[in-house]
Amino acid sequence: MQRQNFRPPTPPYPGPGGGGWGSGSSFRGTPGGGGPRPPSPRDGYGSPHHTPPYGPRSRPYGSSHSPRHGGSFPGGRFGSPSPGGYPGSYSRSPAGSQQQFGYSPGQQQTHPQGSPRTSTPFGSGRVREKRMSNELENYFKPSMLEDPWAGLEPVSVVDISQQYSNTQTFTGKKGRYFC
């Protein structure tokens, strides 16, 4: 806050340096040298106050980022402990046990559930297919399976327009084209 004198450099510095405007200009010229003076307060305020707080702040952030990104956690998470350790341990101990349990109950489940399932769908399916084939033959007629549109012939646009014109003149009503 004592550097506020730098903001009004003209009253204090030309006063003691009162050698005239030239000396004031020399001080103003030295603010070219005073350019270091603003950096000195800026360095005073900036470097000790701003940069060290930002420095340590960025350093803790950097340190927090560096362990996060750099080394221990990601390397630990993505590296040996997580894929190697966790999945390895899970896959080895629980997955092995699950595989053992999966094999033993899975086989038990597949045999009791699989055999009735395989027997019921295939057996009943075959029986149902036979029944459905008999029912279909009894329900549907062979004439129904034929194509009803097979005997149709193509019609030209002129014929259609003549039919519509005839119906309009014949009926006189727009709603009865198909009557």
Curated annotation (Swiss-Prot):
Tissue: Expressed at highest levels in liver and kidney; intermediate expression in skeletal muscle, pancreas, heart and placenta; low expression in brain and lung. Expressed in epidermis and hair follicles.
Post-translational events: Phosphorylated during mitosis in the cell cycle probably by CDK1.
Residues the record lists as Phosphothreonine modifications: T51, T120
Keyword Chaperone: no
UniProt keyword annotations, A-Z: Cell cycle, Cell division, Cytoplasm, Cytoskeleton, Disease variant, Methylation, Mitosis, Nucleus, Phosphoprotein
Outcome of swapping S104A: Has no effect on interaction with PLK1 in mitosis. Partially prevents phosphorylation
Record field: compositional bias (Polar residues): 110-122
One biological process term in Gene Ontology: cell division
A cellular-component GO term for this protein: centrosome
Subcellular location: Nucleus; Cytoplasm; Cytoplasm, Cytoskeleton, Microtubule organizing center, Centrosome
Subunit record text: Interacts with PLK1; phosphorylation-dependent.
Disease: Trichothiodystrophy 4, non-photosensitive: A form of trichothiodystrophy, an autosomal recessive disease characterized by sulfur-deficient brittle hair and multisystem variable abnormalities. The spectrum of clinical features varies from mild disease with only hair involvement to severe disease with cutaneous, neurologic and profound developmental defects. Ichthyosis, intellectual and developmental disabilities, decreased fertility, abnormal characteristics at birth, ocular abnormalities, short stature, and infections are common manifestations.
Name of the protein this chain belongs to: M-phase-specific PLK1-interacting protein
Lineage: Eukaryota, Metazoa, Chordata, Craniata, Vertebrata
Gene responsible for this protein: MPLKIP
